[in-house]
Amino acid sequence: MSARDVISKGEAKMKKSIESFQHEIASVRTGKATTALLDRVKVDAYGQQMPLKQVGNVGVQDAHTLMVQVWDKSMVAATEKAIRDANLGLNPAAEGQSIRVSIPPLTEERRKEYVKLTRKYSEDSKVALRNLRREILHALDKLEKDKQISEDEKSRGKKDADDLVHKYEKRILDIVGQKEKEIMEV
């Protein structure tokens, strides 16, 4: 294995970490209706916790309304309860086999809470990136110790790892800035 291989594997893991962060942050509420808002909702269905997506279709009806089309009529009440209990500040209303979820405007206090949550997610992602960097550096040290790479290759690899971390941390900051702007938009 070469230093390039170690860096490539590390970068692939960093990309996955960023994708995970983007998915995480998509579920943070803004003033607009988005299907990602209900991604984390788990419904008590058939004796187990199931993601909402496995119980019905979620669609955007308009800028402030989501519509959940439940496939099994017997699951409507459980789905409505799961959305209400998800601590998202939503008030779902059942209409036959569908559930209308109105997205109320965010209060200033709630907006600030969501900004804090967004920043927490970004910090968690940065920590994950730094841990991946540590893994890369450890692998490079091991390769040098085993005489598979030279000291120069190791130091180039360390510089590349640092550059990757800075690149992806900047990406996280850009994503957070955009999300904060969306959250604070009235």
From Swiss-Prot:
GO cellular component: cytosol
Keyword hit for Transmembrane: no
Keyword entries, A-Z: Cytoplasm, Protein biosynthesis
Pfam families named among the record's database cross-references: RRF
Organism: Prosthecochloris aestuarii (strain DSM 271 / SK 413)
Any one Gene Ontology molecular-function term assigned to this protein's record: ribosomal large subunit binding
Subcellular location: Cytoplasm
Protein name listed in UniProt: Ribosome-recycling factor
Function: Responsible for the release of ribosomes from messenger RNA at the termination of protein biosynthesis. May increase the efficiency of translation by recycling ribosomes from one round of translation to another.
HAMAP family membership: RRF
Entry similarity comment: Belongs to the RRF family.
GO biological process: cytoplasmic translational termination
Tree of life domain: Bacteria
Gene3D superfamilies: 3.30.1360.40, Ribosome-recycling factor
CDD domains tied to this protein: RRF
Keyword match Nucleotide-binding: no
